[in-house]
């Protein structure tokens, strides 16, 4: 067996009693690597974690750790190899942080739970590793959700495991705490060589922080591999059955789709149009856009939001024909908005917008508004 592989599953099926929730799971969990399970509610992510933690028995296939079937490893020995952090764990309110983390040493301290100086050092180091040493004397009832999650990770770490299993470690946390938790897990994997398997709903963080992604839906693993291999155009939309929205694989953003009627065409580029597009979507308007390079953030937003979008995908400068197509398409909309774009093409985008005005379209010029709110008020009157 490869020495880097901490755990391996072969054709694993998981579920409850005789009901299979997810089948044919093939995983190689490696030292220092993070695996993330992504999928809709009820897809079986938590069931997989419970099975890997031996809280549930496999319904088929096998789970092997260090060349041994998981079911054959004694509980005390397994507790030194695997730590589990599940959602919904209510911490004992009258227990201090240090006391709670010390419970993670129970596989090593014996029946009476006496802590040695080595145990005390490991407890302190685990708290420092997760940035929670200053919380050591506080009661668990005094902690925020983010602090509780850090403490649970510290308790898992003090077990000195080869593998940590986490069920939605960022749920109920604000953005700052989510980022902090993920950075802690990344650091533990990199510095301690701990393998991490987790379930998540934060797609953007999962993609940015994981080495390996597993997509699960309708009882099956539909894709598995590195984020670059798995997260392709349309995959996340299909995974979560997104309607009226789409996920941008490049930016990690979910954008709401605009209306179906052709109401407003925006001439823009260089990030000047994205917020205007989103404002139009909130008003229920159908939107068109042009002209931008494929790497422009406005191009990414337009792909998700707009009915018509004119994006330069060639290796060189946008051809004149693309500007002509945008100008002609704009004539099919009720009015035009100037996003205040920089002149980076010798005035060709401005000329295309001017052509719309010559053909009788109302053009809301950048000089007519000084803020997005002012623009929205003008748009509502059109």
Would you name each region that the model predicts?
Residues 241-318, 337-339, 345-347, 362-382:
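ABC ATPase nucleotide-binding domains
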Residues 53:
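Helix-to-loop junction immediately C-terminal to a conserved catalytic motif
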Residues 61-69, 78:
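Conserved ABC transporter NBD signature motif
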Residues 164-168:
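Catalytic Walker B motif of ABC-type/P-loop ATPase nucleotide-binding domains
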Residues 160:
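Conserved catalytic motifs of ABC-family nucleotide-binding domains
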